[in-house]
Amino acid sequence: MSNVPAELKYSKEHEWLRKEADGTYTVGITEHAQELLGDMVFVDLPEVGATVSAGDDCAVAESVKAASDIYAPVSGEIVAVNDALSDSPELVNSEPYAGGWIFKIKASDESELESLLDATAYETLLEDE
């Protein structure tokens, strides 16, 4: 079973979301997602300043197996991207919940968070796959 940190929120598309002290949200892909994709070779990051809607594809994770869209779990403005992934995309594999984060977003509608899964619901989703 994949590691599913309890403090995070999750999407059905296997993104995770963590609220930061400054009110922004950090987004990445889950350990389960990176296990399915395999070794990362490139991450196409979104543009800082871009406005996205929940469910929009806004980044791409390319691995030795496939390229997979990464979706915005909430609507808002992209306020930062993880530039370290340009040189070290493997951080998505080795540290999916830490150094392998993909972007930070300032949510425009926090009520969208209610549609995300908590750790227990995400674990149930994984069991049903």
From Swiss-Prot:
Lipoyl-binding domain: residues covered: 24-106
Organism (species): Escherichia coli O139:H28 (strain E24377A / ETEC)
Record-stated family: Belongs to the GcvH family.
Stated role: The glycine cleavage system catalyzes the degradation of glycine. The H protein shuttles the methylamine group of glycine from the P protein to the T protein.
GO cellular component, one term: cytosol
HAMAP family per the UniProt record, alphabetical: GcvH (MF_00272)
Subunit annotation: The glycine cleavage system is composed of four proteins: P, T, L and H.
Protein's name in the database: Glycine cleavage system H protein
One GO term of the biological process aspect: glycine decarboxylation via glycine cleavage system
Cofactor: (R)-lipoate
Keyword Glycoprotein (UniProt): no
Pfam families (UniProt xref): GCV_H
Manner of cofactor binding, per the entry note: Binds 1 lipoyl cofactor covalently.
Gene: gcvH
Keyword Nucleotide-binding: no
Keywords of the record: Lipoyl
Highest taxon of the lineage: Bacteria
Matches recorded under PANTHER family: GLYCINE CLEAVAGE SYSTEM H PROTEIN, GLYCINE CLEAVAGE SYSTEM H PROTEIN-RELATED
